[in-house]
Amino acid sequence: MKLTRLTTDHLSVPLGKPSRVSLTDPLPNAPDRVDLLLVQLETDSDVAGLGFTYLIGPGAATVHALIQTELSALVVGEDPRETDRLLAKVEEFFRPVGFAGLAARAYAAIDVALWDITAKAAGVPLAQLLGGWRPEAPFFVSDLTGDVVKNGRSLVKQGATGVRIEIGSGDVQAEADRVRAISESLGDEVWVSVAAEGRFNLVTAQALAHFFEDIGIDCFEDPIPAADDIGYARLAATTETPLAVGSGFNSREAFFRVIRAGHVRTVRPDVCRLGGLTPLLKVATVAEAYHVAVSPVRMPEV
């Protein structure tokens, strides 16, 4: 089987509400839309594949151009089932400028389409092709607005097992108090995660982690900048609050470092930031070897 054609489409979808750093405060200059880049791959058989990537903020035009030009030339004519070899080929091509960043965002759409073709050619759902280990998976809800407790309880009744609360607007005490109120209102049976997207320094993160430890928060996600390996080591050594990291990581090597260091309980890879399912699976394999949980961020439909 060979790839014969790649076509793309660019959709710019208005957001229903501005991106937020907390339950109350929108980001300065917050993006008001999400850009989706769709890729359709055709083959010399009857099988075609669909993939997509997303951007919130700048870069969509660049990603679209990369897909249509360099990346299309790299993959058309290749066997779509050879996902590892194609990833290596693309990474080698981008070595002079680096694969992480917009190139990975662009290739993610192609890689997802490759897996779509591979599963269709095998005649099985993608989940089964990847092993089919879990018949079902728990899920949580995030970015709740309005009456957070009421809306959270409603979604829990519909099957959600937890709630993810974003913080980081600047008033640390006010947000800590809000987290406590939400956690106590939802009850012990509801899993609660607090996400900061790397907005705190180590001292503030340590204080919050101790506070969350006292009130029984289940996970503190990305409390300090992603590249601060030493900071995560110090934070993990001073708190029992489970830590998660990875929503801002742009390479699988970054995940390998934190997994091997043993500072976090959960890693949160973004399939688009990493460059697709192929690199995400490599992260999952290493995480399993070190008994670290994997909870992909965004694009749960993939």
Task: Kindly give the residue locations of the regions a language model identified.
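Conserved beta-strand positions in the central sheet of alpha/beta enzyme cores
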Residues: 162-164, 221, 268, 295
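Shared catalytic-loop signature of beta/alpha-barrel
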Residues: 210, 216, 227-302
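N-terminal capping/lid subdomain adjacent to the active-site entrance of alpha/beta enzymes
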Residues: 1-192, 197-199, 203-206, 210-214
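Active-site beta-loop-alpha junctions enriched in small/polar residues
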Residues: 142-144, 166-170, 195-201, 223-227, ...
